[in-house]
Amino acid sequence: MTHKLTKIVITGGPCAGKTTAIERVKLYYQNLGYCVLVVAETPTEIIKSGITLEEFGKIPFQKAIINLQIQKEKIVLEALPTKLNKDVIILYDRGIIDHFIYVNQTEKTNIEEALNIRRDECYKNYDAVFHMCSTAKGLPNLFFNTECRKEPVEEALKLENLIKKAWEIHSFYYFVESELDFEDKINKLIKKMNEYIKN
């Protein structure tokens, strides 16, 4: 019996709640009997490994992130058993497209050539994209930074808009607005995800 594989990106600007949402979504679908795999956020891994934007420069830094993202996505797909008795959902904490928003057009082309990829082909890696709105947009009083995220609100807003512009051309793109109660935001995300998966 062939079981369904659904590949979903959860993206969004700084302080959108992506990582927390992914943990909640993972648990929700595991409880429904799905096999749920997660491709963790790559920039955080790169930064914690010691490769920083300040020391390595923008292009080597972004190229390292994109290259690792590509490898992680391949590994997860290759690890899937050929015979599995349940449907599979792969959750991506941001996708390849996200990592191109930090460089200009010439730099994008150079990275594509160096890694032998095409951005427009990368959209096909994912079945659906759920964009969680950054609290910087609409709820700036709830915005905060972390060890690996240090953008001011203004920069976070700029990134939010770039992410939206980059992803909204995907064949299934859904924008999840911020809510005062984060539970409402999570519930809205899961509701829309259910509609997509069960369609």
Feature map (PLM): residue ranges:
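Phosphate-binding P-loop
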Residues: 1-7
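Hydrophobic anchor at the beta1->P-loop junction of P-loop NTPases
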Residues: 10
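The conserved Walker
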Residues: 14
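Conserved lysine of the Walker
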Residues: 18
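Hydrophobic positions on the alpha1 helix immediately C-terminal to the Walker A/P-loop
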Residues: 21
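Conserved substrate/cofactor phosphate-moiety recognition/catalytic segment
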Residues: 26-68
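Conserved nucleotide-sensing/catalytic segment adjacent to the nucleotide-binding pocket
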Residues: 51-91, 95-96, 100-109
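A glycine- and Lys/Arg-enriched "phosphate-lid" helix/loop adjacent to the NTP-binding pocket
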Residues: 102, 106-168, 177-184
